Design a protein with these regions (language model features):
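Oxyanion-binding/catalytic loops of NTP- or PPi-dependent enzymes
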Residues: 22-28
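Amphipathic alpha-helical segments typified by the pilin-like N-terminal helix
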Residues: 1-22
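Periplasmic/extracellular, small/polar-rich flexible segments of pilin-like filament-forming proteins
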Residues: 29-120
């Protein structure tokens, strides 16, 4: 039973890391659509030009990954805190999307991932 718990714990941790990386990649790619002359971004959910607030709203609306630690909830949510299994995204200012992810219960500093994405 202990080995199984270790396996599921590692799977949840790795799934959370993957969701974080995919979120950063998706938001970055969607913001680039505006730079390339598209009129909409975030899966046609938001109008160009891209702002941090539009990117946050669009990501929350279009990304449906589940929190590996609490599958009743989505992993991508608007917020500023570290919540286990959650990718918290916020507009830190008009041109920067801040991303915070906690990969393991307890959210120790070693278990925190952060990123910043510019809309410019």
């Amino acid at each position: 039973m202990v080995a199984y718990n270790g396996y599921t714990g590692a799977a949840k941790l790795n799934a959370t890391k993957t969701i974080h990386a995919q979120t950063v990649k998706y938001i970055s790619a969607e913001i680039q659509k505006c730079s390339l002359g598209e009129s909409k971004f975030m899966g046609t959910n938001q109008d160009c030009p891209a702002t941090a607030a539009k990117a946050v709203n669009g990501a929350v609306a279009t990304m449906n990954d589940k929190n590996p630690y609490d599958t009743a909830n989505n992993a991508i949510k608007s917020g500023t805190g570290f919540v286990v299994g959650q990718v918290s995204i916020t507009a830190t200012n008009t041109t920067t999307v801040g991303i915070k992810t906690c990969t393991k219960t307890g959210c120790a500093t070693a278990d925190q991932m952060t990123a910043g994405i510019s809309t410019e």
